[in-house]
Amino acid sequence: MDTVTESKMAIEIAKAGGIGVIHRNLSINDQILEIKKVQKKGLVVGAAVGTNDTELSRAEKIIKCKVDLIVVDTAHGHTKRVANIIKFIKKKKSNKTTLCAGNIATAEAAKFLCKLGVDIVKVGIGPGSICTTRLVAGIGVPQLSALLDVKKGLSKNVKMISDGGIKFSGDIVKALAAGADAVMVGSMIAGTNESPGKII
């Protein structure tokens, strides 16, 4: 989320034992600058890329920055475009960089991403507080159902992040109980001093 994680938030998340993902709604140069601010503190950091043709350049520059995590971030992660950018990143990245892709909501999509060689899948079609997928596309899957289905299609060593639908702390517990290895939050930490969003 572009109003949640830039360097200031990523630094605090890393200090707390997590990893912040610098959003892709910045220019490539600004995103690199935010990544370097976190790295300068000696902390882990991730960065998001999209799937259109200009994102190949973004991905290449992010790989050169030696980020700890690259997230192929799209509303529907079971597509040819997602496959193409994953293949591109896999050829260029080092073994030290973890590759995550999503978002997905089915076992079939999990198998698709696992076959492409991702380390982590990101689960969630429409549950986020600012997500418009359900309104615009008319599709969405309840988060718990999505997690349980995706888990069935995962390869043994591939991890799963639950992305979206966290309104209460208990939602984190439910996601973990459904098999998620980690949980991605947005609105829960938006509007804090560390977030880049403007306070109105």
Give residue ranges: language-model regions.
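Alpha/beta enzyme core
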Residues: 4-163, 167-200
